[in-house]
A protein has these predicted regions:
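Terminal helix-turn-helix DNA-binding modules in bacterial transcription factors
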Residues: 83-128, 144-147
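Short acidic alpha-helical/loop segments enriched in Asp/Glu that coordinate divalent cations
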Residues: 35-42, 63-65
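Basic, amphipathic alpha-helical hairpins
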Residues: 2-11, 25-35, 50-62, 80-85, ...
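Append "Primarily bacterial transcriptional regulators
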Residues: 65-72, 77, 81, 115-122, ...
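N-terminal positioning helix adjacent to the helix-turn-helix/winged-helix DNA-binding module
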Residues: 20, 41-49, 85, 93-97
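All-alpha amphipathic helical-bundle segments outside canonical DNA-binding/catalytic cores
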Residues: 7-19, 40
Length: 147
């Protein structure tokens, strides 16, 4: 297209060159408009994901749950979260979860089993492994350290 525009200018087909230039401007304006709409959509999806995580992380931490609620693919959701935060959607949910777990362990006398059930972990063992992976210590060690 650029080659055709240059040729038109050189061969003094000024009217053709003007039309080609206008076509190029229109093309790039439409492309920019599309990119802006996509960016806005991605921001909306990310904001809704964050809201949903705050509402549901205690009962559901699976990416398909969130992508289904947002009517997007799990990959698309993960790409957006990674673009916005630098971490995966799973990591985002895990970080939200560990904040709550730490708060419950340090500010309540609830048993660790009760906390794991309240946070909807399938078992005490799964909760313990999750907590250790996220913090480097067991729930008991964390509680003792923060008391």
């Amino acid at each position: 297209l650029l080659h055709t525009v240059r040729s038109s200018f050189k061969s003094s087909h000024l009217e053709s060159a003007k039309h080609l230039t206008m076509s190029m401007l229109y093309f790039y304006a439409r492309k920019l408009e599309h990119l802006e709409k996509d960016k806005k959509k991605r921001e909306i999806v990310f904001d809704r994901f964050c809201d949903d995580v705050r509402k549901f992380y205690k009962i559901n931490r699976s990416i398909p749950f969130y992508s289904g609620r947002l009517a997007v693919s799990s990959k698309y959701l993960n790409d957006i979260v990674k673009e916005k935060t630098g971490i995966t959607a799973n990591e985002y949910i895990d970080r939200q979860t560990i904040i709550e777990c730490k708060a419950l362990l340090s500010s309540t006398d609830m048993s660790i089993l009760k906390i794991s059930l309240m946070m909807h972990f399938p078992s005490y063992s799964v909760f313990g492994k999750f907590f250790k992976r996220m913090t480097g210590m067991t729930p008991t060690e964390y509680r003792e350290k923060t008391k």
